[in-house]
Amino acid sequence: GWVKFCEYYYPELIGNLSSCKSPQQMMGAVVKTYYAKEKGLNPENIFSVAIMPCTAKKAECKRPEMNSAGHEHGNADIMDVDCVITTRELAQLIKSKKINLNNLADVKYDSILGESTGAGVIFGTTGGVMEAAIRTLYYNVTKDNPPEELLNWQSVRGLNGVKEATVSVPGVGEVSIAVCHGLKNARTVLKKVKNKEASWQFIEFMACPGGCIGGG
């Protein structure tokens, strides 16, 4: 949602966006490359479904550039993610099939990769991407685990529309950041950026109030 908003209303800023894809699209590419190879599957026979809180993810998976796996296999028609259903749609599907989750037997999670980190858990809430990114920056630069304050970084948490903070990273210096959720707040932040009234070096935007978990 945020990327589409920027493309429509602030196309001159597209070059400043992170080149990282969303976790949905990263996982889709992994499923049809690494997973397909590990399981001996033809990626053309894999139908990859993502379950997401955000309705905008449906459009994201259909973007023509979201076919990294297709390029890997020499078939541009292979999309990384074939279909997205929202968490609300999943709940409706479960109810329509009269499935009682409490009556289902526990089974072992068939993980193809390591289980998520703490940073992965908070990724979908406002401030979560920023917190994860700063922790990663700290580790990659210093080769040490982040200090306790970066593992419980209250400055970027909470539901204020725009949050600001400065963090010191050895070898980098002071990094000025902002966290914004809700597109009304995004306009306010981007106005400051365009008018050169802001000194932020890294800004997290999420379209929905509260972050991606507020979508759907």
Task: List PLM regions with ranges.
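Iron-sulfur-associated redox domains of electron-transfer enzymes in respiratory
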Residues: G1-G216
